[in-house]
């Protein structure tokens, strides 16, 4: 049996994150020191970091059941953010009056919970996870969707920008969350409702946020009474939209009759083509040569890895399928070689190594025949006083969890293309009795 190095590493990262960042005495996720994503004197992580970790741990359940009990601990940690007013998670631990509730954060929480519910072998836990995911998606559909302009708002506050911005991240994440939930439910009427909503999200992105190369721009914001396009382009917006479209491709039973659904394959392939253009905005243009690293961090790029992977299996006959898989594997190889922190078994955040240290700047310049100068990033370092470049580098939960999710996408490619690889050659049957073992894309 050949070894799936990506799967082994992804599982190791998930385990190391739990050992490093989970406090079993309080069921909280935090850090021993102030780092990016933590808040207050106890260095507790904001819900975004915990959500990405929940997604990574849920991914692990596809391959092994050994993290099921640990996922239950993460679920308990997420409960500390839960608002009984909104039936969703606050950005930080809930207290009376806390109305800091982001739709994109909650969509990622729902993705993790729905995926875990799909794969867990414990029916009681499954019901708890899926119920919470349903509550979140209900809020998003009923309150997050802008009834006049379409799209999902960034935040539950309705007092104007930036809270009311119609963002690609909130809209695409919500689509994926709805589809992951649809896969975890048995009720065909609920499935149909969720699939229809997800398709509305995808159509809205297609009609409002694409650039000329089918890359997703960041969103719309209201300025002087007019909606203005923010043309910033990040890996996660395009990647998550591709994942949503790939999932829709596998749910044909529920997409029949949806307006313009016949355009879905073209939408998906066009976006994949843009995402693979190494001369485009998703790639670091300081790189020279045929391979360029993504111009982003791990917890954004993980969504592009997943999007390209799911596309390659949703449309396996596309001429872009194999290049998409190669890109996912190449980015994962770079990740493991340069961003891994050997001592902790965790990961830095930035693919731009020149933001980490002078030594890694030199490695980047050598690898890519580049000429970058060291640009220290405070988010890669312990949050303390003093010059940024003198602060110690440190791992973060969100950076490491994002790396794990990138590795799971690479692992899935190896497993499918070489079924003798990896920890599990037969994918686990969902606990609710369905025999669909291709939940990643269908």
Swiss-Prot record:
**Residues bearing Phosphothreonine?**
361
- Looking at the record, which segments are called Disordered? 416-442
Origin superkingdom = Eukaryota
Which terms does the UniProt entry file under GO BP?
carbohydrate metabolic process; meiotic cell cycle
Molecular function via GO: mannan endo-1,6-alpha-mannosidase activity
- One Gene Ontology term, aspect cellular component: nucleus
Q: Where is the composition biased (Polar residues)?
A: 416-429
Q: Which portions of the chain have biased composition (kind: Basic and acidic residues)? A: 433-442
Localization per record: Cytoplasm; Nucleus
Q: Which InterPro entries match?
A: 6-hairpin_glycosidase_sf, Glyco_hydro_76, MUG_Protein
Which Pfam families does this chain map to? Glyco_hydro_76
- Keyword Transcription regulation among UniProt keywords: no
Role summary = Has a role in meiosis.
Q: What is this protein called?
A: Meiotically up-regulated gene 191 protein
> What organism, scientifically named, is this protein from?
Schizosaccharomyces pombe (strain 972 / ATCC 24843) (Fission yeast)
The gene name reads mug191
């Amino acid at each position: 049996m050949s070894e799936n190095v990506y799967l082994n590493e992804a599982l190791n990262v998930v385990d190391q994150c739990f050992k490093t960042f989970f406090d079993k005495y309080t069921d909280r996720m935090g850090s021993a020191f102030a780092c990016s994503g933590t808040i207050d004197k106890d260095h507790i992580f904001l819900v975004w970091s915990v959500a990405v970790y929940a997604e990574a741990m849920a991914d692990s359940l596809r391959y092994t059941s050994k993290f099921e009990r640990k996922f239950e601990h993460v679920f308990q940690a997420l409960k500390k953010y839960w608002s009984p007013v909104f039936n969703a998670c606050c950005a930080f631990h809930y207290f009376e009056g806390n109305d800091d509730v982001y739709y994109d954060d909650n969509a990622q929480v729902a993705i993790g919970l729905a995926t875990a519910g799909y794969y867990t072998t414990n029916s009681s836990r499954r019901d708890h996870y899926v119920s919470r995911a349903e509550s979140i998606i209900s809020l998003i559909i009923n309150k997050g969707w802008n009834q006049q302009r379409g799209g999902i708002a960034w935040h539950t506050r309705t007092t104007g920008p930036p809270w009311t911005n119609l963002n690609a991240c909130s809209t695409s994440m919500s689509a994926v969350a709805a589809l992951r939930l649809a896969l975890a439910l048995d009720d065909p009427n609920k499935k149909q409702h969720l699939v229809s909503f997800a398709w509305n999200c995808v159509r809205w992105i297609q009609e409002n946020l694409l650039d000329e190369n089918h890359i997703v721009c960041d969103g719309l914001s209201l300025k002087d009474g007019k909606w203005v396009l923010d043309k910033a382009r990040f890996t996660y917006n395009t990647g998550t939209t591709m994942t949503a479209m790939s999932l829709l491709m596998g749910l044909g039973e529920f997409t029949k009759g949806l307006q313009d659904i016949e355009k879905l394959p073209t939408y998906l392939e066009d976006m994949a083509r843009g995402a693979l253009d190494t001369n485009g905005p998703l790639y670091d243009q300081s790189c020279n040569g045929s391979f360029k690293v993504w111009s982003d961090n791990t917890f954004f790029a993980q969504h592009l890895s997943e999007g390209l992977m799911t596309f390659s299996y949703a449309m396996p006959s596309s001429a872009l399928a194999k290049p998409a898989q190669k890109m996912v594997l190449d980015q994962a190889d770079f990740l493991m070689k340069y961003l891994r922190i050997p001592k902790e078994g965790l990961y830095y955040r930035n693919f731009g190594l020149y933001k980490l240290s002078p030594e890694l700047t030199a490695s980047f310049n050598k690898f890519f025949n580049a000429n970058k100068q060291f640009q220290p990033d405070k988010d890669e370092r312990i949050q303390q006083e003093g010059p940024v470049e003198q602060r110690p580098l440190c791992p973060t939960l969100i950076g490491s969890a994002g790396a794990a999710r990138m590795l799971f996408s690479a692992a899935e490619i190896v497993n499918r293309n070489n079924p003798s690889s990896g920890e599990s050659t037969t994918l686990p049957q969902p606990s609710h009795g369905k025999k669909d073992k291709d939940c990643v894309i269908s």
